[in-house]
């Protein structure tokens, strides 16, 4: 099974993506990790990508698409979950064209939907336990809301990540994601149109619900 997953930062996309990956034994392919690996290995594409990243610019699609395809064909030959790409409509169209040319099926596209303000509240509400950062604590989610400044799992002290409190950075990321004309949602809707044509499946999930309910809904639809 080959799967694309969309969802704004704060929607629980990582949690549900991990569920799908583990349940179907898929390779988890994340665009940021692809760049880091190529740069670390000093590949030609990695060197080209680094030149743009060092200047604070987006890596062009003619570099990104070949990187993604290479990983899909090698690491994902038995099935993959692609996360973090495409980020805009142009990339979505180019990715689809490349998949068609390579004869790679896209079996399913998952979109986790969440109101922009709620997504922002969840990001800013995240708290890290000093004993184990994997303990779920979020002051904006009732199901995992901590008791004051102590971890709801172990009682350890909690702190917030500085980047989770950077409203400007959060807003910029969400500006890209929630752009329905050219941004990430436009990319998701491109695949939704393909699903209407019978070329893939498109699963929409209400991300405002609790994790277990979303999980059950997702597994039922898959």
Predicted region positions:
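Glycine-rich phosphate-binding loop of ATP-dependent small-molecule kinases
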Residues: 1-222
């Amino acid at each position: 099974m080959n799967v694309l997953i969309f969802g704004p930062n704060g929607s629980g996309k990582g949690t549900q993506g991990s569920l799908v990956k583990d349940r179907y034994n898929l390779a988890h392919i994340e665009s940021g990790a692809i760049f880091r690996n190529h740069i670390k290995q000093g590949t030609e594409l990695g060197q080209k990508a680094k030149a743009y990243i060092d200047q604070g610019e987006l890596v062009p699609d003619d570099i990104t698409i070949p990187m993604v395809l290479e990983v899909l064909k090698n690491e994902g030959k038995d099935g993959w979950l692609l996360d973090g790409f495409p980020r805009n409509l142009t990339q979505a169209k180019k990715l689809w064209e490349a998949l068609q040319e390579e004869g790679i099926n896209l079996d399913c596209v998952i979109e986790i939907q969440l109101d922009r303000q709620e997504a922002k509240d969840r990001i800013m509400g995240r708290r890290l336990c000093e004993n184990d950062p994997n303990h779920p604590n979020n002051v904006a989610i009732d199901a995992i809301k901590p008791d004051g400044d102590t971890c709801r799992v172990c009682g350890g002290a909690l702190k917030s990540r500085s980047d989770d409190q950077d409203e400007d950075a959060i807003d910029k990321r969400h500006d890209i994601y929630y752009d329905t004309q050219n941004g990430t949602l436009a990319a998701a809707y491109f695949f939704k149109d393909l699903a209407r044509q019978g070329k893939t499946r498109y699963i929409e999930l209400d991300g405002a619900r609790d994790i277990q309910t979303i999980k059950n809904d997702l597994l039922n639809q898959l």
